[in-house]
């Protein structure tokens, strides 16, 4: 009798996980995901209602970082995390996932520490001075995000 060893191979498919509460590029994410046949998981707190007919939607209790931790808990190496939150981006990178912000900036081990440092310094400055908020979002910001996300997917798929 001959013995055969069957090799079991797990194939992992990239997914897009979105810290979606204040995400201004949900439409762009869905456009690319549908084109690339990727799953999308949108994470919201319970102050939001959302349905797009494509994404898996998670509605979580409104609380300290509940959305952030739920997103990171299901993330895996190779996923793309869309977030404005440097802490979430840091945790994503530690899991060997990719992280990108709403303007198309791809977070990496080289830039995340300087971003965290700058955030801390800016928080100190804001406490002592009246500073304006971020500039108004433009259509070009959405185009930049779309192009960066598409490039990130194509380079790592």
Language model features by range: what are they?
Residues 15-157:
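Nuclease catalytic cores that cleave nucleic-acid phosphodiester bonds
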Residues 9-10:
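Short, positively charged and aromatic/hydrophobic N-terminal segments
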């Amino acid at each position: 009798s001959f013995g055969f060893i069957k090799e079991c191979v797990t194939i992992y498919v990239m997914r897009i996980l979105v810290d979606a509460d204040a995400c201004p590029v949900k439409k762009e994410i869905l456009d690319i995901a549908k084109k690339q046949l990727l799953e999308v998981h949108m994470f919201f707190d319970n102050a939001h209602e959302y349905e797009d007919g494509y994404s898996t939607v998670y509605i979580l209790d409104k609380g300290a970082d509940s959305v952030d931790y739920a997103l990171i808990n299901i993330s895996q190496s190779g996923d793309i995390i869309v977030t404005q939150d440097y802490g979430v981006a840091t945790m994503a990178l530690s899991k060997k996932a990719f992280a990108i912000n709403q303007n198309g900036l791809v977070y990496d081990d080289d830039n995340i520490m300087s971003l965290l440092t700058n955030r801390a310094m800016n928080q100190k400055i804001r406490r002592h001075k009246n500073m304006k908020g971020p500039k108004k979002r433009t259509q070009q910001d959405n185009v930049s995000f779309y192009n960066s996300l598409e490039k990130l997917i194509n380079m790592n798929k």
